[in-house]
From Swiss-Prot:
Gene3D superfamilies: P-loop containing nucleotide triphosphate hydrolases (3.40.50.300)
Enzyme class label: hydrolase
SUPFAM superfamilies: P-loop containing nucleoside triphosphate hydrolases
NCBIfam families per UniProt: GET3_arsA_TRC40 (TIGR00345)
Residues annotated as binding Zn(2+): C282, C285
Family: Belongs to the arsA ATPase family.
Binding site for ATP: K33, G34, G35, V36, G37, K38, T39, T40, E244, N271
Disulfide bond annotation, renumbered to this chain: none
Function: ATPase required for the post-translational delivery of tail-anchored (TA) proteins to the endoplasmic reticulum. Recognizes and selectively binds the transmembrane domain of TA proteins in the cytosol. This complex then targets to the endoplasmic reticulum by membrane-bound receptors, where the tail-anchored protein is released for insertion. This process is regulated by ATP binding and hydrolysis. ATP binding drives the homodimer towards the closed dimer state, facilitating recognition of newly synthesized TA membrane proteins. ATP hydrolysis is required for insertion.
Stretches that traverse the bilayer: none
Protein name: ATPase get3
Gene this chain is encoded by: get3
Species whose genome carries this gene: Aspergillus niger (strain ATCC MYA-4892 / CBS 513.88 / FGSC A1513)
């Protein structure tokens, strides 16, 4: 375990080549604890995919939005080409976008005749008191947009562990919100009709119907895509970690949760590994390498049927096209430490 040299008796190739080669994949998620090199890995994987796919879209759902920093190029909520590539695009979206912004994006919505009385706002507040409904609708809106863009493969640079798997619960969240809104609409509908009728406003509480239609449309989108997420031919999840206790613990928890949702995961990227020379007198380097070796052995034992990719700790930050491309090469060509290690 002191090096990343491939042996002929290895059961699983220690690279992400199998992910790159799987042409049926449509959705690839890259996730892990904060600070483990998740964004670098997702950018580098997208670069490799761009070599073999017609069109690749890289999406950051991490509020920190590190894609712009990684490529040295500003990205926003609209997909744009990455400088130097003709088939790799990127976008950064806010998964916690305002629910009011989402509803305002509906077609043909004018001024809300209920807003002056606060009734519409009250019903929205009641419906959106369900935990996670803001995030669920934002994510659904992104998926709806992504589906219409027709990219061959989409790579998600996800938020740190803990937020990563929330999307799996979104269909249930939206169904709860829909049920609550429907109940409110049936209860208050007659009252709203009489109020609106006397004011000469829109008939039948139209803004509530629009809200229900909007949420139903998003729920259908997210339910459809979630079914694709559970198809191993279409979706896989790449875990990123470092060889330390907390990161390994988070990775194990994440893999168990992915498995419980029937989402394929068979690749782990272990970043920031030290390979000190045998003659090295750096006590800290040797001590840290010893610790990393212990956790690498645990990873090997726990995930013997996974592609475990070992990536070295680099002396410089991986930022910019050139450095990302070098890093990406190591995802498909196993890193071999210099002689004497």
């Amino acid at each position: 375990m002191s090096s990343a040299v491939v042996h002929s008796d290895d059961l699983m190739e220690p690279t992400l080549q199998s992910v790159v080669n799987q042409k049926t994949l449509r959705w690839i998620f890259v996730g892990g604890k904060g600070g483990v090199g998740k964004t670098t890995t997702s950018c580098s994987l997208a670069i490799q995919l761009a070599k073999v796919r017609k069109s690749v879209l890289l999406i950051s759902t991490d509020p920190a939005h590190n894609l712009s920093d990684a490529f040295g190029q500003k990205f926003g909520k609209e997909a744009r080409l990455v400088d130097g590539y003709t088939n790799l695009s990127a976008m950064e979206i806010d998964p916690n976008g305002s629910i009011q912004d989402l509803l305002a994006s509906g077609e043909g919505q004018g001024d809300d005749p209920l807003s002056g009385m606060g009734v519409g706002g009250m019903m929205q507040d009641l419906a959106f008191s369900i935990p996670g409904v803001d995030e669920a609708m934002s994510f659904a809106e992104v998926l709806k947009q992504v589906k219409s863009l027709s990219y061959e493969v989409i790579v998600f640079d996800t938020a740190p562990t803990g937020h990563t798997l929330r999307f799996l619960q979104f269909p249930t969240v939206l169904e709860k919100a829909l049920a609550k809104l429907s109940q409110l609409s049936s209860q208050f509908g007659p009252m709203l009709n009489s109020i609106l009728g006397s004011r000469g406003g829109l008939p039948g509480g139209q803004n509530i119907d629009e809200l229900l239609q909007k949420m139903e449309s998003l729920r259908e989108t997210i339910s459809e895509v979630n079914s694709q997420f559970k198809d191993a031919d279409l979706t896989t999840f790449v875990c990123v970690c470092i060889a330390e206790f907390l990161s390994l613990y988070e990775t194990e928890r994440m893999i168990q949760e992915l498995t419980s949702y029937n989402i394929d995961t068979h690749a782990i990227v272990v970043n920031q590994l030290l390979f000190p020379k045998q003659s090295s007198e750096c006590e800290q380097c040797n001590a840290r390498r010893k610790m990393q070796k212990k956790y690498l052995e645990q990873i090997e034992e726990l995930y013997e049927d996974f592609n475990v990719v070992r990536m070295p700790l680099l002396v410089e930050e991986v930022r910019g096209k050139e450095k990302l491309e070098k890093f990406s090469d190591m995802l498909v060509n196993p890193y071999v430490p210099p002689e004497g290690n």
